[in-house]
């Protein structure tokens, strides 16, 4: 199968080489893998079923329906996603503090701070909901997580023009810090954002660990 897929992929890449279109990307999974992930509502596979277009159906396979997960399964998924996503955020923030800021790479610092926030918000969403939305927008992500704790509403205050400007720069940095030559952010603004994101990091760790502990309690109560 892999050899056949490799030949098909090369053929499509040759066909698209002189075109302005993006190359088609192929993801091949066994039906058992697909159904196992559909059963536990894994977001990548459920989105494909909800939004994908069927091009061919042999009629030999049937897609599974998401089932109600046990508290143990919910807890295990939440722990796995926390262990996967939260360290990324910590590493991104560490790179900003230890490497980009000392070298005065301020635009790269802004971009990596955006990535840190994104991963922290993703961590919260996966632990609390087992779902990731298709957005990189910090404003949207911050709005989505606020329902889980009042603390999250205070991470980026909007009381002064300076606070509003810093948050706006953070939100814009995903694109503009890399591709807009006129994008500019100061050392002071970055230091302010780092301090706020440190707070978000601590809140994220505590909230997620508390939620996972809650799942543990629910699991134990069911067993009893």
Model-derived features: positions:
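Terminal alpha-helical segments
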Residues: 2-224
